[in-house]
């Protein structure tokens, strides 16, 4: 036979050099062939193949040097072996060679090989640990040669113990001195040689380490005596049953696995003394004898396998049954892990002794072992010594990594992975089926978790702590983990409410902060203005649209840009923009602001208020030092709407480039990450809405931006800021700014009640009013028509037709205002049907859509825009010639701002307003606006005004106050507090007060009310009536436990005439009639007596929950998870009824869920999970509704 003896000169070896170039080409082919059958020929389960990926990363650094040493020793041998093996990889000789292993049978297909390890369990044990460790080394070699060697070594490993015994001695002799042609057997035998190398290293490391430990522990004799004692005590019990796999031991030299020691000590007790000898490896049998003994004793001694938790010190004891159970339930059951950890802590702690081993000694031992040849492995001891050496080698490698750097925790975490993997690879249990059932990923993760925990305790122990203290720590950590994994569904409400809580800014104590000084006043009165007396100044102000000022020492108005005290760069930009001279508000406001005064500026729409506060801000910023890293802005501009913020930011841009400044526009609806990135790069100016500014200040614990350097604050459209609900947010932001700041307020309308509120933020302000507080510009032609509702759309089409019929108005724009979001979308649909290209904008749209719509409208892509009052402020379109109030504004200021969208910057425009007979209340403000702007009031409108005033005098109507009348955020805070109190009382957190139930019922929070229904668990009919809880329907107790009913089985009817039976039947009829109401009342068991009914059942009504909550408990994915976890049956029954509708007498009950199970426990668990899903779905529905409300007149932006 060609390959009978595996001689050093096999057939085909002469082609070694010529075929060397095929190494990389054949690698993929051989890997594919080996994948099909290689692992099964090696008697190893498929799991070993799956472990390769993380084995490769684990020991790459550790074994690379040892592999290179062996490569240098056997490099020439491999050259010939590779080529020979490649040539004869699938040859007849190979099959002949395998005949000895397979009892002279031909090569079998891979399909039959799958079950071979079950019937050759004895042969599978031979050299298993050698084989696994050799694979690891070959995998970690980066060269192509090593990869080829890895595949061949894996294939060579398929040799059974019979061949191994007969040929290993013959192979090992010529391994080192053989010429290159005579190295074939060395290459084919590389895996066994690697295994011998590994065991030799472990032995040498064991001896060297134990010498130092024995020196500190009192010598080797005490340990040997303890080993003998343990062996004799356990010998009788172990010999009567099937021996369990050997267990990987801890690093302690004082204790070994009793089962392994007992089995070996019974046969060879006299060899135990070798463990305490010198570091030199004792002489034992050759490698072939070791392999033979392994094959012969495979039924008596099982290979090593780690059955305890892998730690930084060693291994804890754990039975095979416990390991199997833990591997199957690793992800859910923490009980086994806790038990194993406690067992681990009962072992002696060798951490301090291990750390005493010098790193250099350990490394030196490894180098010494690597330099030894294959012949040195013949000095290996008995199987007992080999097992001890394996344990010691693993511990030695751990010490080496830990001694390199104790501070780095990553290496100790990786080392337990190495220990567990090595032992898994080097030792396998005898039962193949049990072995295959163990998931390698679960075993790996379990070992990693335990190892990390033990490493942490090891460092605690090094800080002079008792040895047994880590056991208590383990228990504490387990308790924490279990509690975190098993949190109640009620806790989810607290978590959700915590996430929903608005971000809050801490209160700043300005007295403790040392602000750097800054200069406010930059204005020097020109000589020509200083010569004017009071009469001339009054006449000048009258010429400038009747400027009215109030305050102390107000500067005189300027007439030219050169008198404002601005810089050269700013004046150049003004000249390029075509601003010839200041407007009325600019001529008075710029000198006042440049003087460092706080200013309230009220001017008509389109009068240039934005430039009036921007130009002084640029001069203010340029006077201060440049921004440094992580410093906040100097100028802060807050606006009520996002559109106004973007418009102000655009007006800043021409000046920013010339002055080398940066500005950031921050508003809600846009991605906050982009705004944060711009702020971190540094910006002197922030144009923002209050809500987003608070988000930015609170983001990342306040490290995104700050208000330390803010000295110039602008509130544009200030009245809207305070009455639209921004007052708490604005005051919160302003309270974080230095008190010596300069604050400027501008608006086109400023009611008296808003003025008192705004003055809280100012210091001795100068009030400037141009043309009246709430006046429409005279350039705007105002038309008010009283007409029925059904004629407004026809009149709208007529107005649009007249506008675009004129060729001069080809590029004109039209803006239509409505009062509600739904009306905007409906009017958009109607106009599109009539052929007018248009778009709509309102608070319910995304910010991206709103921005693009306004840009398209300004660019003329579509000429008609339909909007709510969200576009009434700040929208500046030069070509806008027609404004139509399709729905009349409800107060004066809104009318002024709507009409002010046209006729801007001296241009003319038209504003048409539709009034219906029912809108007498609104006619008063419109008539007032007409009078103040110098226009006549139509007769029909005046009649409506007189009629309404008569009703007010008679008490039938109440006069409406001026202004928007926003309720602010106090109402929202009150509702939130009421919801929190209701929640506390509902779940009995111990913080609830004695609030009146009826008062709490008046508080309407839809999300919390729906959530209250989430715990509608079925209670027993005999249970006492629960106490009424606010917000919870009658008969439902959130704190009541889940009651599971025992299903009644149908019994054969009896024909007796017992009076008690008649009474029972009458009661049953009454209950049946009552149940026909169709409502699944709490505590009423269902009529479920069929043969397929479960022994226990419970019901959960879901009809009144929002759609998201119902979907959460009825979708197939969630239900399947519950069914798999509990083994119950979940059925959706009944019919869905909309809110407010109740089922009729003969109709199905409301939608509910039926849960059936064999035990009360599984039904309870399923009900608890369903209730948790209901709560989450209810809260999610409430959140989504809060983020995007269905409708609303105004939106807090």
Swiss-Prot record:
Basic and acidic residues: compositionally biased ranges: 23-37, 51-112, 120-129, 151-172, 185-213, 321-341, 968-991, 999-1011
UniProt-listed CDD domains: DEADc_DDX46 (cd17953), KH-I_PRP5_like (cd22474), SF2_C_DEAD (cd18787)
Acidic residues: compositionally biased ranges: 365-386
Pfam families tied to this protein: DEAD (PF00270), Helicase_C (PF00271), KH_12 (PF23469)
Cysteine-cysteine disulfides: none
Binding of ATP, residues: 603-610
UniProt-annotated location(s): Nucleus
EC code: 3.6.4.13
UniProt-listed GO biological process terms: mRNA processing; RNA splicing
Domain of life: Eukaryota
Motif DEAD box, residue numbers: 716-719
Reaction(s) this enzyme catalyzes, per UniProt: ATP + H2O = ADP + phosphate + H(+)
Entry's Gene Ontology molecular function annotations: ATP binding; ATP hydrolysis activity; nucleic acid binding; RNA helicase activity
Domain Helicase C-terminal span(s) in chain numbering: 795-945
Keywords: ATP-binding, Helicase, Hydrolase, mRNA processing, mRNA splicing, Nucleotide-binding, Nucleus
Biased composition (Polar residues): 233-251, 402-426
GO cellular component, one term: nucleus
Ranges for domain Helicase ATP-binding: 590-768
Motif (Q motif): 559-587
Bias kind Basic residues: ranges: 38-50
Entry note about domains: The Q motif is unique to and characteristic of the DEAD box family of RNA helicases and controls ATP binding and hydrolysis.
Homology family: Belongs to the DEAD box helicase family. DDX46/PRP5 subfamily.
Protein name per the record: Pre-mRNA-processing ATP-dependent RNA helicase PRP5
Gene that this sequence comes from: PRP5
